[in-house]
């Protein structure tokens, strides 16, 4: 499946204003349709410092019993324990635009560290 990371400044307003604020405190993957494009959003939840990262590594569709499940493989990076980071609450998020034509029936997040 093809996808591309979307720079935060180029995200549709629906994603930045509605979806990310609602889900940023959770650790999950979700998909949404905006202007006929399907986006996948991976959130890491609330973190106590800067330095936490999330990125989408790959995605596949699994079909079972007439249901399509989007499996999202995400890389989570934690800050180096030997490095000082800002003591500020952060919400790591990664948004990618996919080549999907419709929303999947379900989404499963598989995390890799």
Question: What do these predicted regions represent?
Answer:
Residues 1-113:
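Exposed, flexible binding/inhibitory loops of compact, secreted disulfide-stabilized domains
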């Amino acid at each position: 499946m093809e996808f591309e990371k979307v720079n935060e400044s180029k995200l549709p307003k629906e994603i930045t204003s509605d979806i990310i604020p609602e889900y940023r405190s959770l650790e999950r993957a979700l998909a949404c349709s905006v202007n006929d494009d399907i986006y996948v959003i991976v959130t890491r939840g609330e973190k106590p410092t800067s330095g936490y990262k999330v990125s989408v590594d790959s995605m596949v569709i699994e079909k079972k019993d007439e249901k399509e499940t989007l499996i999202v493989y995400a890389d989570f990076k934690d800050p180096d324990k030997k490095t000082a980071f800002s003591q500020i609450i952060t919400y790591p998020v990664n948004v990618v635009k996919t080549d999907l034509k419709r929303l999947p029936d379900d989404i499963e997040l598989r995390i890799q560290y």
